[in-house]
Amino acid sequence: MSVLTIDTATDREGRDTDPARSWNPIGRILFRFGFLYFGLFCVFYPQMLIDFAGPLQRRLPDDWPRLWMSVSLPMVKWVGHTVFGTDVALHETGSGDQAVFWILVFCLLVIAAAGTVLWTMLDRTRTEYRRLSAWFLLFIRLCLAGQMLGYGFAKAIPTQMPEPALTTLLTPYGDFAPMSVLWSQVGVSPVYESLLGTAEVLGGVLLLLPRTRLAGVLLSLVSMAQVWVLNMTFDVPVKLLSFHLMLLCLVLLVPEAPRLTAFLTGRAAGPPATPQPFRTRRTVRWAAAAQVLLIVWLSAGYVWIGADNWREYGGGSAKSELYGIWTVTDFTRDGQPVPPLLTDESRWRRLVFDQPKMAVVQRMDDELMPLGAQIDTGAHRLVLRGAQATTDLADLGYEQPTPNRLVLNGRLDGHPATITLDQLDLGQLPLRTGRGLHLIQEDANFGKVMG
């Protein structure tokens, strides 16, 4: 018997049919450690159990991760200060690789290791944990399924990596961080993103259907392995979670390892080997029905969240009334024409309108300056204000002699100014015109990059 093998047999309904058999001593120790560590991780890592709130997630406060970690955070801070000599805090940045999470994992490892030693000393006569392992595997399978559905719907409804913003099109490639490259590469092809998400959603659904759980584990393992590699190579701050999701897949595969080996080597695979917590035909059916309802509950929540995100900042979001990239052709300040000198810190090169109530000024040195924007289409008035400013940067009237021309006239930074801008034809950008499927291509299309 393999060290990690849980020797069991089940009938076609998933019920145990063989009497309990002794486990390998090393296997018992590894189970105790895995039970403690992965059980604690699923409970204390703030993202694992929140999925089960389903549609109620929309009602949770924005600082729910801090509230979730309120129990473990004092311990984590103490360990960080005492053991690692650093003061850690939970930042609401969306990063899953903050120091506070790494120290949390360290604490869980220490607790699991100490608990394993104590458990082994107090439970030396126990020869197997078949019943307990059945409930443990069910618990982590549900947790894994929730994560697969959550991340899957975020891509299937393409909002996790939205289409590159207009300012992204103006940013030099060398200024991109690796994560920006990955996000833009996926976001430029919503179909590709949706297919990635569909695979993850399918993995989550298969995990929750009793007869397809093994297929769900295998599909989830492939998906999470790819995600983890991308996170590691593009420095995406979800390395810790994606690695643990991949480990959960491997833990779920442990009981099925002999069957998979037999199948891959052309031998009879036999019945499912994963122990089941339900013993009667009736409870098995009730459990299967409950898992189907869980699919509906979780999916409803994530479809709702995805639809809201799609309308808020995805492809279905509202655009600015003056949407587009506007290039300055004439710039007059205090009645004097201002030449387009790269050293001029006050002259504009471009003005970008993308999201409502936002504008971005591109200076002559190509620096991008985000601003708040109030556009009154009735009065043809544009007010711009910096993020930290207490007074308006610009109060300008505007007119459009033609759809592709914009004339601003008013006060800019306390000076009278008149600015004439022409709208950039986004169709001229290879990233926009080169999209789509081309079955016939005489040459590779690298846009303007290769010259």
Please identify what each model-predicted range represents:
Residues 80-111, 189-198:
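Individual transmembrane alpha-helix segments
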Residues 121-122, 126, 254-293:
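Cytosolic-side transmembrane helix boundary signature
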Residues 137, 142-146, 277-311:
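Internal/C-terminal transmembrane anchor helices
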Residues 142-170:
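Transmembrane alpha-helix/helix-exit interface in multi-pass inner-membrane proteins
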Residues 165-266:
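Hydrophobic alpha-helical segments
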Residues 294-383:
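Membrane-interface segments at or immediately adjacent to transmembrane helices
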